[in-house]
């Protein structure tokens, strides 16, 4: 029993191994000031176990470990040993140090014009909020965006817009082809003239007072009168038509509606019902002939009549319905119930 117990203890001890402490210390924690690798003479090592149980009749399995086990135990500090296997993380160099003719941008970096990445900056290489904001370049869009979004008219320009950066200029120049349409659209929207709806009304009021911007360069009234027709002829606008209407004498109103007379208001009220579709004499005559021939039209005949008279089938059907009701009413009037 004692020999089997020692065999099982040695076999389990050799399978478990004690290199886990060094590996985990190198991976997950920095080495301490006095920490060193395990020396070759540690009592719990497999070499010591072999020396202790040398009188055992069972030979140890030497194929489990390589011949360099003793050399691995006597090592310098674990951090220096594992540096060849696990390379430490080195932060990438900032984008400003890259080649001037090359555009480098990480896929994790937010867009310069994106609201969440404002202030991240391609020049600083940081995540966001640490470096300066995006700086527009002459070739890029005005607000540094790389996608076509209508800019806000009320937003003030950023204070960092006056500074210049090599990284932002390279990024703007490389993406100028993609943002050509959007930049042109934004420049037109921001710098183009705006024409409000009531601009011609203001011009009209200024021309009436004689002190507005619409007055010509001349100071006398003759100069004003001579400059207005030429301006209207060159640039026609609704204001010109209003001025022409003012020059014409006012016409008296055709009829004054009495607000206290509901009959007059009802006569001149605008009808909400659908307008009637009067038929021409030729269409009415042909429909009457067809009605005298047959009071009820088949579908094929109704289609033919509608095609000949340039009407719709619905119009022909409704006309025949009304004509039958009219004939029924006339027959009732000719034959009273008393007879």
Swiss-Prot record:
It comes from Mus musculus (Mouse). Belongs to the Abd-B homeobox family. Keywords: Developmental protein, DNA-binding, Homeobox, Nucleus, Transcription, Transcription regulation. Residues 155-176 have a biased composition (Low complexity). Pfam families: Homeodomain, Hox9_act. PANTHER family: AGAP004664-PA, HOMEOBOX PROTEIN HOX-D9. GO terms for biological process: adult locomotory behavior; anterior/posterior pattern specification; DNA-templated transcription; embryonic forelimb morphogenesis; embryonic skeletal system development; embryonic skeletal system morphogenesis; forelimb morphogenesis; hindlimb morphogenesis. It is found in: Nucleus. Transmembrane segments: none annotated. SMART domains: HOX. GO terms for cellular component: nucleolus; nucleoplasm; nucleus. Residues 272-331 bind DNA. GO terms for molecular function: DNA binding; DNA-binding transcription factor activity; DNA-binding transcription repressor activity, RNA polymerase II-specific; RNA polymerase II transcription regulatory region sequence-specific DNA binding. The gene is Hoxd9. Sequence-specific transcription factor which is part of a developmental regulatory system that provides cells with specific positional identities on the anterior-posterior axis. Residues 114-132, 211-223 have a biased composition (Gly residues). It comes from the Eukaryota. This is Homeobox protein Hox-D9. Residues 114-198, 211-263 are annotated as: Disordered. PROSITE patterns: HOMEOBOX_1 (PS00027), HOMEOBOX_2 (PS50071).
């Amino acid at each position: 029993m004692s020999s089997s117990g020692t065999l099982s203890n040695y076999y389990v001890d050799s399978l478990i191994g004690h290199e886990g402490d060094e590996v985990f210390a190198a991976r997950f924690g920095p080495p301490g000031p006095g920490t060193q690798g395990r020396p070759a003479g540690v009592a719990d090592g497999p070499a010591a176990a072999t020396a202790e149980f040398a009188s055992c009749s069972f030979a140890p399995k030497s194929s489990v470990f390589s011949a360099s086990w003793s050399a691995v135990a006597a090592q310098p500090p674990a951090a220096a040993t594992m540096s060849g296997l696990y390379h430490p993380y080195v932060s990438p160099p900032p984008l400003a140090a890259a080649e001037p003719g090359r555009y480098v941008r990480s896929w994790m970096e937010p867009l310069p014009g994106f609201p969440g990445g404002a202030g991240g900056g391609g020049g600083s290489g940081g995540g966001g909020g640490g470096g300066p904001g995006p700086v527009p370049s002459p070739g890029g869009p005005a607000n540094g965006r790389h996608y076509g979004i209508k800019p806000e008219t009320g937003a003030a320009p950023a204070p960092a817009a006056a500074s210049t950066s090599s990284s932002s200029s390279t990024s703007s120049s490389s993406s100028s082809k993609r943002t050509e349409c959007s930049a042109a659209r934004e420049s037109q929207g921001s710098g183009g003239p705006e024409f409000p709806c009531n601009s011609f009304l203001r011009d009209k009021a200024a021309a009436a007072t004689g002190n507005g911007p619409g007055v010509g360069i001349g100071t006398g009234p003759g100069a004003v009168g001579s400059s207005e027709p030429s301006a209207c002829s060159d640039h026609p606008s609704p204001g010109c038509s209003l001025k022409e209407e003012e020059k014409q004498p006012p016409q008296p109103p055709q009829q004054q509606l009495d607000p206290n007379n509901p009959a007059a208001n009802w006569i001149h009220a605008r009808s909400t019902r659908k307008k009637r579709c009067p038929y021409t004499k030729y269409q009415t005559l042909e429909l009457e002939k067809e009605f005298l021939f047959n009071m009820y039209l088949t579908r094929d005949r109704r289609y033919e009549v509608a095609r000949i008279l340039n009407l719709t089938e619905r119009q022909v059907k409704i006309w025949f319905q009304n004509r039958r009701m009219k004939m029924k009413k006339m027959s009732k009037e000719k034959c009273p119930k008393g007879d």
